[in-house]
Amino acid sequence: PYSHPVSDSVLATREWSVCMRIVVVGLGKVGRALTAQLAAENNDIVVIDQNPDLIEDIVNIYDVRGLPGNGGCYEVQKEAFEGGADLLIATTSSDEINILACLVAKKLGTQHTIARIRNPEYEKQLRFMRDELGLSMVVNPEKATAREIARVLRFPSAIKREQFCRQRFELVEYRITADNPLV
């Protein structure tokens, strides 16, 4: 496994309060962005990818550990965190590997799993994946983007929008000028 050259000596001399033990599977654009954000929040992160060069790049930039290999493999995940992680986020380009990675993580004791699933054929199976397979969350980036664009278009002149109660309610802020009939 790769480890951060500075972190091993720093951890020995400084007291760190680590928020969560997180495994990120897949170091594409999404995986790299998540790693950057989660590392900035001082989480204990292990990244898994089949490309050792990507792992080395990430490990040299952020205070994370890296494992080369298939994130859907039991042996690879077992090496990431003994006793399971708090969270596994699978962001590879393969829906099937993302699902498998989440299943393996659950069996290893990981509390929460998030899978990036892009194939619309799996849309009807999302409830099954959550309820029966134990996935905490399924994210479809294209669908989420389309939903956000549609939400912005509903209130194009709004300054700010906040959603509540699992997106069932929305609070919208507008700037009203003095000549507005509502004033």
Show where each model-derived region lies.
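Cytosolic regulatory regions of ion transport systems
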Residues: 9-183
